[in-house]
């Protein structure tokens, strides 16, 4: 279980760093729809995105209170 928690934390760290790099860099162009969906805190759902999708598998971040809505995990 400890290995799973370590891998989960590593995954969340890498995912957040990739999103920060995509947001700040001019050379990396994230699709507007995906960028708005994952990084917009003023979304129409009124929720904070957890930074993962739930298209094929459920939200891994349900342990911190996230749930799936419109194929993106929100808290």
UniProtKB/Swiss-Prot annotation:
Tissue specificity = Expressed in fruit, pedicel, root and stem but not in leaf (at protein level).
Per the record, the domain of life is Eukaryota
Name the UniProt key words of this record, in alphabetical order.
Antibiotic, Antimicrobial, Cytolysis, Disulfide bond, Hemolysis, Knottin, Plant defense, Signal
Pfam families, per the entry: Cyclotide
Q: What is known of its domains?
A: The presence of a 'disulfide through disulfide knot' structurally defines this protein as a knottin.
Q: Which SUPFAM superfamilies match?
A: Cyclotides (SSF57038)
The intrachain disulfides are 50-66, 54-68, 59-73
Which interval of the chain is the signal sequence?
1-24
InterPro entries xref list? Cyclotide, Cyclotide_bracelet_CS, Cyclotide_sf
Please report the propeptide residues according to the UniProt annotation: 25-45
UniProt family annotation: Belongs to the cyclotide family. Bracelet subfamily.
This protein is called what? Chassatide C8
Enumerate the Gene Ontology biological process terms.
defense response to Gram-negative bacterium; killing of cells of another organism
């Amino acid at each position: 279980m400890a290995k799973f928690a370590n891998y989960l934390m590593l995954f969340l760290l890498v995912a957040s760093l990739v999103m920060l790099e995509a947001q700040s860099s001019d050379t990396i162009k994230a699709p507007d729809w995906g960028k708005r969906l994952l990084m917009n805190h003023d979304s129409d759902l009124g929720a904070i995105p957890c930074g993962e999708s739930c298209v094929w598998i459920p939200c891994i971040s349900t342990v911190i209170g996230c749930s799936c809505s419109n194929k993106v995990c929100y808290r």
